[in-house]
A protein has these predicted regions:
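Gly/Ser-rich oxyanion-binding loop with an adjacent helix/lid
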Residues: 1-20, 27-30, 35, 39, ...
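C-terminal nucleotide
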Residues: 1-25, 50, 54-88, 187-329, ...
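Short Gly/aromatic-enriched secondary-structure transition segments
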Residues: 37-44, 225-226
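A structural signal for short, well-ordered beta-strand segments
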Residues: 114-116, 209-211, 341
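FabD-like malonyl-/acyl-CoA
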Residues: 130-131, 340-344
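Glycine-rich phosphate-binding loop
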Residues: 337
């Protein structure tokens, strides 16, 4: 297999001087509540997006090339930093959006040549978009000499999603990609914008299963869920979901109506589940963790209505394996409408667990399941400039 470094050299005829890596993420629990000011528990994972960069004084032009689109190279300049330059859902929008977000703060992207490489499947709910945004943010900061905090970087990348891509996302993905810590989950308070690392129990592996259903968050369903929660909050006469109890939601069921009631019930119960899951994780209470993950998935399926048959089959298969055999929890991860499931399993049974998932998935849908084992990873990072050498 040709290395990414050799591919870059063949494409551009020069050697890069900078390598940037940004991981994907899974979320253990706390779905669709980051944009409601709740707490979430994501993990940065090993699959990642890599940028190789060669600074150039080519009139300020920025050349972008993705290894997944070998025949296409893009040349852009600061005047191109306007929302929706090209069709929605194109990866270039994320890159241009980050450059635009920094330009709004007076930080311009110097001319450079960029090669983009990925081991993250796009549309699998693993935050490939946030990884790409964060990688480009680090690129801009390194080349411009103007760095910022992990939080400010995440906020600029979030602005990219809102204004350039059209997805009203919360802050979880960008923060988890930027602040990931090896062997730890991150307890992120999205209202206070604070991060507390929580060490994962030794001996647990993360199994990620791609449902094969690609999700597209800019198509309106994600926005509808957020708008429904905002409407429910207004009906409940509160300014924060942190102030609302399940009792209050139940009391106002008739006023909310069926759809808003279900959205509100998910919001308040998911916030409570995150608090309980954090305590269970710290105290290594595996059965409690598994139950909370199952309750979370059921709520996303029934109340928030963002699951799909493929996700449900994978989660059910996980719990059918049995906690007594080393299974510690399963749920959909990410915004839903397809994407992936996350499974916590003991490292000694990870391989047999994957075969179990593949068998159940094949039987249900007649196609092969793509899944992999991963670990909690460090967040986005730069590689020292003098360590990059092409193969001889």
């Amino acid at each position: 297999m040709i290395s990414d470094l050799d591919q870059f050299c063949a494409q551009y005829g020069c050697t890069p001087s900078l390598r940037i890596e940004a991981p994907g993420r899974v979320n253990l629990i706390g779905e669709h509540i980051d944009y409601l000011g709740g707490c979430v528990m994501p993990i940065a994972i090993e699959p990642k997006i890599t940028l190789l960069v060669a600074p150039e004084s080519n009139g300020g032009k920025i050349e972008l090339w993705s290894a997944e689109q070998e025949d296409t190279k893009y040349k852009i300049s600061p005047k191109d930093f306007t929302p929706k330059t090209i069709p929605e859902e194109h990866w270039l929008n994320y890159a241009i959006g980050v450059m635009g977000a920094y330009a709004e703060q007076g930080v311009m992207t110097p001319g450079c040549r960029v090669g983009i490489f990925s081991t993250l499947p796009a549309g699998a709910g693993l935050s490939s978009s946030a990884a790409l945004e964060t990688a480009f943010a680090l690129l801009i900061e390194e080349l411009s000499g103007q760095s910022c905090s992990i939080l400010e970087r995440a906020l600029r990348c979030q602005r990219d999603e809102h204004e350039w891509v059209g997805v009203p996302c919360g802050i979880m993905d960008q923060l988890s990609v930027g602040a990931g810590l090896k062997n730890h989950a991150l307890l992120i308070d999205c209202q206070e914008q604070s991060i507390k690392p929580v060490r994962l129990p030794k001996g647990l592996n993360l199994v990620v299963a791609d449902s094969g259903v690609k999700h597209a968050l800019a198509d309106g369903e994600y926005r509808e869920r957020r708008q429904a929660c905002e409407a429910a909050l207004e009906i409940l006469h509160e300014n924060s979901w942190r102030n609302i109890s399940l009792e209050s939601v139940l009391k106002n069921q008739d006023v909310l109506g069926d759809r808003l009631f279900k959205r509100a019930r998910h919001a308040v119960t998911e916030m409570q589940r995150v608090n309980e899951f954090s305590d269970a994780l710290i105290n290594n209470q595996i059965p409690k963790m598994a139950q909370l993950m199952q309750d979370s998935h059921n709520s996303l399926r029934d109340d928030f209505e963002v699951s799909c048959p493929e996700l449900d089959v994978l989660v059910d298969a996980g719990f059918a394996f049995g906690v007594e055999k080393g299974h510690a929890g399963s749920r959909m991860t990410g915004a839903g409408f397809g994407g992936s499931t996350i499974h916590l399993v003991h490292e000694s049974i990870a391989s047999s667990f994957i075969e179990h998932l593949r068998s159940r998935y094949q039987k249900a849908f007649g196609r092969e399941l793509n899944c992999f084992i991963t670990q909690a990873s460090d967040g986005a990072r730069l590689q020292p400039l003098n360590t990059l050498k092409p193969a001889l």
